[in-house]
Design a protein with these regions (language model features):
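HEAT-repeat alpha-solenoid elements in large eukaryotic scaffold proteins
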Residues: 1-7
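Alpha-solenoid ARM/HEAT helical repeat scaffolds used for protein-protein interactions
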Residues: 10-14, 253-256
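Core helices of alpha-solenoid repeat scaffolds
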Residues: 12-24
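Alpha-solenoid HEAT/Armadillo-like helical repeat scaffolds in large eukaryotic proteins
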Residues: 25-29
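Short inter-helical turns and helix N-cap capping residues of alpha-solenoid HEAT/ARM repeat scaffolds
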Residues: 33-34
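ASCE P-loop NTPase motor core, strongest for the SF2 helicase catalytic module
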Residues: 44-56, 70-310, 330-369
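A short helix-loop-helix "switch/interaction" segment in the helical subdomain of ASCE P-loop NTPases
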Residues: 315-324, 354-360
Length: 369
């Protein structure tokens, strides 16, 4: 990986015609057991992602020296880059389990994107507007992947296909809702959720039963308090609902969650950036540690120029640097963010129903009024 990193940095734009030959092998190393290899692979992948928008038909003349086989391979693998850079190009994904819901077209696109991330062991942030079905889309890929993994293990007995449980972490007010939604949309034949809640003694009993369930739903505080238990398990999916909660990477909660081991990591949030650009770094540090560099490197490269450009007293040079930093950050994170707002999908949404309910004031309310 060190040699490849040197090649990428040394060739710079000269490596663009060969991007497709490097991206998938680098992806494979991003899940390496060696942490140093993982970090170096993530660093290389980040460098390649920044160059991906340049890989288009306009540079096909660079393919001249390549053999016919390599040109054919490059043409076929460009489809991967198209899917990575534009979620709408993701191949249509057929769910392997029945879902008790009719997916709207934008929800199917969301599932297609989640399946693409799954196929290449990538991780991402689904940040649709509230009410567009982030939970349903997540349940679809969760149930389908669990079923496929189970079937593959039955057929091959491969160690890397052995069924693993998944974990959903969400605010305490949503844990019951998640269990309800899973049971509503998916048969217990495919997902058996465990509502992991209660006082310490009750949770200790639930830990003994956890192996009988393939999905655990718990709140952020409980996962933080019981991290010694959760960190010992290898999860298939780890989904953070309202994941912007970990926007401050220095909190005990964020540090605890980053100890979790999972094949696939997904964040659900309607607001990936709440206060400052640095919020995004913490989210990606959970998804793909090293992808946006260290916190200090991120601040130096992105946060500081962007903040300085927004100052009313900033110079034209600082404003230009801020725009360039924003564009660079956008290119780097765009493949791993999917956001649709209600205005984008109005044609898919049912008509709004408005009902008025009249309530009698209580005696106390009457006096106050």
């Amino acid at each position: 990986m060190h040699s490849l990193s040197g090649v990428i940095e040394g060739l710079s734009l000269g490596i663009v015609p060969y991007l497709v030959f490097l991206v998938v092998p680098v992806l494979g190393r991003m899940s390496d057991q060696d942490e140093a290899v993982r970090l170096m692979a993530t660093h290389c992948f980040a460098a390649l992602v920044r160059l991906m928008p340049l890989d288009s038909g306009a540079i096909d003349e660079a393919g001249g020296p390549l053999s016919a086989d390599l040109r054919e391979r490059r043409a076929s693998e460009r489809h991967f880059l198209e899917q990575l850079m534009n979620a709408r190009h993701a191949d249509n994904y057929e769910l392997s389990v029945p879902i008790n819901a009719q997916l709207r077209s934008y929800q199917q696109e969301g599932v297609n994107w989640l399946a693409f991330l799954n196929k290449y062991s990538l991780h991402g942030i689904l940040c649709d507007d509230m009410g567009l079905g982030k939970t349903l889309q997540s349940i679809c890929i969760l149930a389908s992947d669990h079923h496929k993994r189970e079937q593959l293990y039955k057929e091959t007995q491969r160690a890397d296909a052995k069924p693993l449980p998944s974990l959903v972490v969400c605010p305490p007010t949503l844990t019951g809702h998640w269990v309800y939604e899973v049971e509503k949309f998916v048969s217990s034949q495919y997902l058996q959720p465990l509502h992991y809640t209660g006082p310490p003694m009750e949770r200790a009993r639930l830990q003994e039963k956890a192996h009988k369930h393939n999905l655990v739903v718990a709140s952020y505080d409980i996962v933080r308090n019981d991290i010694d238990f959760f960190a010992t398990i290898r999860w298939n999916y780890c989904i953070l609902d309202e994941g912007h909660i970990i926007k401050n990477g220095r909190t005990k909660l964020a540090r605890a969650l980053k100890q979790l081991q999972a094949n696939h990591r997904l964040i659900l949030t309607g607001t990936p950036i709440q206060n400052q650009v640095l919020d995004l770094w913490s989210l990606f540090d959970f998804l793909m540690p090293g992808f946006l560099g260290t916190e200090r490197q991120f601040a130096q490269r992105f946060s500081r120029p962007i903040l300085q450009s927004r100052d009313a007293k900033s110079s034209s040079r600082e404003q230009e640097a801020g725009v360039l930093a924003m564009e660079s950050l956008h290119r780097q994170v765009l493949p791993f963010l999917l956001r649709r707002v209600k205005d984008d999908v109005l044609q898919d949404l049912p008509p709004k129903i408005i009902q008025d309910y009249y309530c009698e004031l209580s005696p106390l309310q009457v006096r106050i009024h």
